[in-house]
């Protein structure tokens, strides 16, 4: 046996390493938190890494988890060694195939990063809701508790499945295990060969379907035999626990790590025992070890085998002295007599004829913390004479009173473990740097190391908290650090937003990235921060990491700067050695992105320590120390102050059950209260240079730049610094004009500056919008913004929507989202909310737009002064088109019903009023405004009628005002998982609008390839470059002939985007808008992304067109191209995107081959669209359509 090899990696990689080696076919589909297992598999296959039998596994991405399960089923039936990975809703889509796979006794292992199921809300975080929904499929279910166990059980589960023919579901906790970095011992291939028997593999192959030995499976059976046939599998399941134990024993002999299906630890004469499975067992073991050392007779039973459930083995694993048992489930089954594990344990003891006191409890739903204090709380609760059954721990249930008490100050943290916490921003690289730090510590010292990273669901601007532990012994602490020796705050703004120093221990180190120097920083610390520093005797260090990063050319990414500071202060390695290791990790991490990126990071490392200063700490707090600002102002609504404000302050765990809505319904228009201050620079308007075109407003991803025209009298109480000028548009003569920025909501992306066409003639590098540091401007611009909001909005009926400058005066009803800085999707959502938001219903597919659009604590969908605004909901990823169609048919029916009821009141209202309402076509803004007035008039006249008929009418009266239904999602939904439903809706003819924000990848799950991904682009799940062309969704929709279709790119042509939205809404049927949306996953400069869209259109890589079937009624061609012929080859534009450029570095010949094919795709597509657009309805070529000659041959020659 070879010497042990150690590596520091997370649970996903630990599992994928084994699953890859033991597979020939791997069917994948992305879903958080399991996606990295598929990503690793795809990357290794792209590197031609062989499996255990010397062949490279075939990795295939499917359109959904249902598709992946079907592919797995087919591959298994054909004799291949096959696996897949999933979680949550993805597992739900696999259930039908799982029943089949198990029923056919087909060996395989499905690896699941266990995650919550969407119920009253979606959650990407971990519990056992998903796997418990699979417990009746016939799959064996094995639970691993740590990264090491996940690595080991990937092998044990597979070996047992081959030996028994029973497929296995191997699960581990999402995020807590899947994303936790741990130093583990890797399994050498000889151990895998020792456990995987050749005879089992050959038997599996021998059962394959083949025409050389034809047989039939998947029959339809009748009542005469189905029952008997179902019972034939009993011997296989009965033998499984014995076989598993044999495999575990052999594994222990080979590795020295010993497991049991039901493993007890604790006092040999324990009286109180906890039973549970998953990562919580590690915390429970740490706590039980601590308490038994103090003489307490307590214990823990780790359940590793959940299905088949071997009750006799579970009972026999416990000491005979046990009197009370608490069974903990990490899921909730509403309406059940108890959660699954509880019921199984209860049944096991009943059948054994032994009945200690057994109670059940719930813990840890959606990655809710499970700490030693809670474990002790459960054990203490068992000490009561009549302990509460069906309890919860870790929450305050003041509604049903299920929660039990515990002492949160109880701790089992060892003094030998160094504990560090880092507060960062999703876009600053903190998490990535800390993952590298953990690897350096784990692999270059004798320490064991653990890293865990807490994210919220916002995009790249989210708060991240990294928890690092390292010490001389294995680390079982699967919970967040509450007592930190080292605290680093990588964003100055956090100090005034939440309690950064609360976990710091006495005498600890505090490192802060600050815009202030060492001499001035103390007086800038908030009063509470100063007091904590003094009270806890903290050593304080500061660096202006933003300046260091900017000077090195790294922009906002301060990660390597702060990482260097950490190693310099922590002393875990000699300083020079640490810096050398950091540089090695930089090369490894950024090498694929180009040597320039590597050199920038190394430059930052080299210049860091010269800018790191220790801060002298006074003995008392400064008299003029600033106070921490309130999380939300006093004038915010009560629910915002008392509930959402707590979540914003990172105190959501303290909210009681009664504070939260029972059905998941939340108010809109709440992002206005969350001032994140994440933009270090904000745009500053120069009215003397501005041409008042509106471009900066229309492209702003977060609706923080707005324009208004108003009468001069409105300026009477304007702040001194409030800027304005005379309105230039002849429609607004005599009015004043202002462009104003919301300073605390701006993310500092700089897109507005890049698109601004107005140049300062005296200083050519300046424009009408220029970036400036936010901090000095914050107070002044906050006052200006508040004043600006109080200015009246222009009358919507007076605006000419054919002009951008006019249209952008419409109030956005989508504002301040948590999307990435420079997001390419949100400008479209803002635009549609401006145009139709006051009458709009949104069905939003799961994806980026559902997360920044509907993630707690605040939501960007807003309301106007009348309280109207978009009504929004998310169902699932796969059913959004059908979900939105449900909106439409319900509205149509209720509108019809309202009309029927209205007619019955003709006597009270008069025929004229009834007729006026029913005959209003509502095709214009003015029509809709008039209809609202008429309907309101009717409601006023009928509201005092207390008849059932009147009350019924009033409940549906508002449906007489036209409602605009928008079905919104990304390309992963529209091109892949939801395409079947989308196609059905396209064929329905119903009046719905569909907006596909095409980022050409699965942006929400981290940038995996979809069928929208263009050929030659590198993405996750397409590590070797996507070999196939992009799906043409628009052309497919056009084949119906009665669907309005538009392909738009706001950065290429603003006016065409507006026109497409207006036409889509006006079209009396299905409309589909496909909107190019740049994304950070493209590896581009987000500041220049809008202008890059124009370059893509100029190259023909993206087409601008509108297909309006109504034109056919006029004898015109429905297809209108809104662009000229391609002007440049695509390789002159796409290589500014790293997703294309990186393949030229890793596989230059393959990159060249794929790029040539990609250019051919563009040429062919353009030629076809141009041909279609030039045809008249009679079939002849219309030579006067555009007057532009095609040039695909010229383009082809340049490639």
Curated annotation (Swiss-Prot):
InterPro entries on file: 4Fe4S_Fe-S-bd (IPR017896), 4Fe4S_Fe_S_CS (IPR017900), PFOR_II (IPR033412), Pyruvate:ferred/Flavod_OxRd (IPR050722), Pyrv-flavodox_OxR_EKR_sf (IPR037112), Pyrv-flavodox_OxRtase_EKR (IPR019456), Pyrv/ketoisovalerate_OxRed_cat (IPR019752), Pyrv_Fd/Flavodoxin_OxRdtase_N (IPR002880)
Gene name, Swiss-Prot/TrEMBL: nifJ
Signal peptide: none
Xref: Pfam families: EKR, Fer4_16, PFOR_II, POR, POR_N, TPP_enzyme_C
EC number(s) from the headed UniProt entry: 1.2.7.-
Enzyme class: oxidoreductase
High-level lineage: Bacteria, Bacillati, Cyanobacteriota, Cyanophyceae, Synechococcales
Name of the protein in question: Putative pyruvate-flavodoxin oxidoreductase
Binding locations of [4Fe-4S] cluster 2: 700, 746, 749, 752
Highest taxon above the source species: Bacteria
Binding site residues for [4Fe-4S] cluster 1: 690, 693, 696, 756
Catalytic activity: oxidized [flavodoxin] + pyruvate + CoA + 2 H(+) = reduced [flavodoxin] + acetyl-CoA + CO2
Keywords: 4Fe-4S, Electron transport, Iron, Iron-sulfur, Metal-binding, Nitrogen fixation, Oxidoreductase, Repeat, Transport
Assigned protein family: Belongs to the pyruvate:ferredoxin/flavodoxin oxidoreductase family.
Single biological process term from Gene Ontology: electron transport chain
Cofactor info, note text: Binds 3 [4Fe-4S] clusters per subunit.
One MF term in the entry's GO annotations: thiamine pyrophosphate binding
Cofactor: [4Fe-4S] cluster
Annotated coiled-coil segments of the chain: none
Annotated function: Oxidoreductase required for the transfer of electrons from pyruvate to flavodoxin.
PROSITE patterns, per database record: 4FE4S_FER_1, 4FE4S_FER_2
All copies of domain 4Fe-4S ferredoxin-type, residue ranges: 681-710, 737-766
Binding site for [4Fe-4S] cluster 3: 820, 823, 848, 1079
């Amino acid at each position: 046996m070879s010497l042990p090899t150690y590596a520091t990696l997370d649970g996903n990689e630990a599992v994928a390493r084994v699953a890859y080696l033991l597979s020939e076919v791997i069917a994948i589909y992305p879903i958080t938190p399991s996606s990295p297992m598929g990503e690793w598999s795809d990357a290794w296959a792209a590197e031609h890494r062989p499996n255990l039998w010397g062949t490279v596994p075939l990795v295939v991405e499917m359109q959904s988890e249902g598709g992946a399960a079907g592919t797995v089923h087919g591959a298994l039936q054909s004799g291949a060694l096959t696996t897949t990975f999933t979680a949550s809703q993805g597992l739900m889509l696999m259930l039908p195939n799982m029943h089949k796979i198990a029923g056919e006794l087909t060996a395989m292992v499905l690896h699941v990063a266990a995650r919550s199921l969407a119920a009253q809300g979606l959650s990407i975080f971990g519990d056992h809701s998903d796997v418990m929904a699979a417990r009746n499929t016939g799959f064996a279910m094995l639970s691993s508790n740590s990264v090491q166990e996940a690595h080991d059980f990937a092998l044990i589960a597979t070996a047992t499945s081959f030996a028994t023919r029973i497929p296995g579901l191997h699960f581990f906790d999402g995020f807590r295990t899947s994303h936790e970095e741990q130093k583990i011992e890797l399994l050498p291939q000889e151990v895998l060969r020792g456990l995987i028997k050749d005879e089992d593999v050959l038997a599996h192959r021998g059962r394959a379907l083949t025409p050389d030995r034809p047989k039939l499976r998947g029959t339809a059976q009748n009542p005469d035999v189905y029952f008997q046939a179902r019972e034939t599998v009993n011997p296989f399941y009965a033998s499984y626990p014995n076989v598993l134990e044999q495999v575990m024993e052999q594994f222990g002999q080979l590795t020295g790590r010993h497991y049991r299906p039901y493993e007890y630890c604790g006092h040999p004469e324990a009286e109180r025992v906890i039973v549970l499975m998953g990562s919580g067992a590690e915390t429970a073991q740490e706590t039980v070890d601590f308490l038994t050392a103090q003489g307490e007779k307590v214990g823990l039973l780790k359940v590793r085998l959940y299905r088949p459930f071997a009750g006799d083995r579970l009972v026999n694993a416990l000491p005979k002295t046990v009197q009370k048992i608490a069974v903990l489930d990490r899921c909730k089954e509403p309406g059940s007599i108890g959660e699954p594990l509880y019921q199984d344990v209860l049944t096991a003891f009943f059948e054994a004829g032994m009945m200690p006191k057994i109670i059940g409890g719930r813990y840890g739903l959606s990655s809710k913390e499970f700490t030693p204090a809670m474990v002790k709380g459960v054990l203490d609760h068992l000490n009561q004479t009549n302990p509460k059954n069906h309890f919860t721990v870790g929450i305050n249930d003041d509604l049903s009173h299920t929660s039990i008490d515990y002492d949160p100050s109880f701790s089992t943290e060892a003094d030998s473990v160094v504990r560090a916490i880092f507060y960062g921003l999703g876009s600053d690289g903190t998490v990535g740097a800390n993952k590298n730090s953990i690897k350096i510590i784990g692999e270059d010292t004798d320490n064991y190391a653990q890293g865990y990273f807490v994210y919220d669901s916002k995009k790249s601007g989210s708060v991240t908290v990294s928890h690092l532990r390292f010490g001389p012994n294995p680390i079982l602490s699967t919970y967040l650090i509450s007592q930190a020796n080292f605290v680093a705050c990588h964003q100055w703004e956090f100090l005034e937003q939440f309690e950064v120093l609360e976990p710091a221990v006495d005498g600890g180190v505090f490192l802060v990235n600050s815009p202030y120097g060492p001499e001035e920083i103390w007086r800038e610390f908030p009063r509470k921060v100063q007091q904590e520093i003094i009270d806890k005797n903290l050593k304080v260090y500061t660096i202006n990491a933003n300046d260091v990063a900017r000077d090195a050319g790294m922009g906002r990414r301060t990660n390597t700067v702060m990482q260097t500071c950490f190693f310099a202060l922590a002393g875990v390695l000699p300083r020079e050695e640490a810096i050398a290791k950091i540089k090695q990790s930089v090369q490894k991490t950024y090498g694929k992105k180009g040597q320039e990126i590597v050199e920038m990071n190394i430059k930052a490392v080299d210049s860091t320590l010269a800018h790191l200063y220790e801060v002298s700490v006074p003995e008392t707090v400064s008299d003029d120390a600033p106070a921490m600002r309130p999380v939300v102002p006093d004038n915010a609504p009560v629910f915002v102050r008392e509930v959402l404000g707590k979540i914003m302050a990172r105190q959501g765990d303290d909210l009681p059950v009664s504070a939260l809505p029972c059905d998941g319904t939340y108010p809109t228009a709440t992002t206005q209260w969350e001032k994140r201050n994440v933009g270090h620079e904000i745009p500053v308007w120069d009215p003397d240079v501005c041409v008042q075109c509106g471009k900066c407003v229309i492209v702003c991803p977060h609706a923080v730049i707005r324009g208004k025209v108003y009468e001069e009298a409105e300026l009477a109480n304007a702040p001194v610094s409030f800027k304005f000028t005379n309105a230039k548009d002849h429609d607004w003569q005599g009015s004043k004009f202002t462009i104003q920025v919301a300073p605390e909501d701006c993310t500092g992306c700089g897109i507005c500056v890049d698109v601004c066409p107005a140049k300062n003639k005296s200083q050519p590098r300046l424009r009408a919008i220029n970036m400036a540091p936010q901090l000095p401007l914050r107070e002044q611009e906050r006052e200006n913004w508040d004043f600006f909001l109080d200015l009246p909005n222009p009358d919507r009926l007076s605006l000419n929507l054919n002009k951008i400058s006019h249209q952008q005066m419409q109030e956005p009803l989508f504002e301040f989202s948590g999307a990435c800085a420079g997001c390419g999707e949100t400008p479209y959502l803002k635009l549609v909310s401006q145009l139709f938001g006051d009458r709009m219903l949104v069905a939003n597919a799961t994806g980026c737009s559902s997360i920044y659009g509907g993630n707690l604590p605040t939501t960007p969908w807003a309301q106007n002064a009348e309280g109207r605004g978009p009504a929004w909901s998310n169902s699932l990823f796969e059913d959004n088109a059908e979900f939105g169609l449900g909106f439409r048919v319900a509205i149509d029916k209720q509108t019809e019903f309202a009309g029927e009821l209205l007619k019955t009141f003709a006597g009270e209202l008069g025929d004229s009023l009834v007729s006026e309402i029913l005959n209003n076509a509502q095709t214009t803004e003015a029509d809709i405004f008039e209809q609202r007035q008429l309907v309101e008039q009717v409601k006023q006249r009928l509201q005092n009628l207390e008849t059932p008929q009147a009350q019924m009418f009033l409940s549906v009266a508002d449906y007489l005002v036209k409602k605009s239904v928008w079905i919104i999602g990304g390309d992963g939904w529209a091109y892949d998982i939801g395409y079947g439903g989308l196609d059905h809706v396209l064929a329905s003819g119903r009046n719905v609008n569909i907006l596909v924000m095409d980022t050409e990848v699965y942006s929400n799950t981290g940038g995996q390839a979809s069928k929208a991904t263009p050929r030659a682009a590198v993405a996750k799940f397409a590590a070797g470059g996507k070999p196939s062309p992009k799906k043409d969704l628009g052309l497919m929709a056009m084949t119906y002939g009665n669907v309005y279709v538009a392909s738009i790119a706001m950065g290429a042509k603003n006016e065409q985007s507006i026109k497409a939205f207006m036409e889509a809404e006006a079209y009396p049927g299905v409309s589909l808008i496909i909107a190019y949306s740049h994304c950070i996953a493209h590896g581009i400069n987000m500041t220049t992304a809008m202008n890059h869209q124009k370059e893509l259109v100029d190259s023909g890589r993206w087409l601008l067109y509108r297909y309006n079937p109504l034109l056919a009624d006029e004898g015109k061609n429905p297809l209108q191209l809104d662009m000229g012929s391609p002007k440049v080859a695509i390789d002159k534009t796409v290589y500014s995107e790293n997703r294309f450029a990186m393949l030229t570095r890793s596989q230059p010949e393959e990159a060249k081959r794929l790029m040539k094919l990609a250019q051919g795709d563009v040429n062919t597509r353009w030629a076809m669209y141009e041909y279609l657009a030039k045809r008249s309805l009679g079939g002849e070529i219309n030579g006067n359509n555009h007057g532009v000659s095609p040039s695909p041959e010229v383009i082809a020659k340049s490639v």
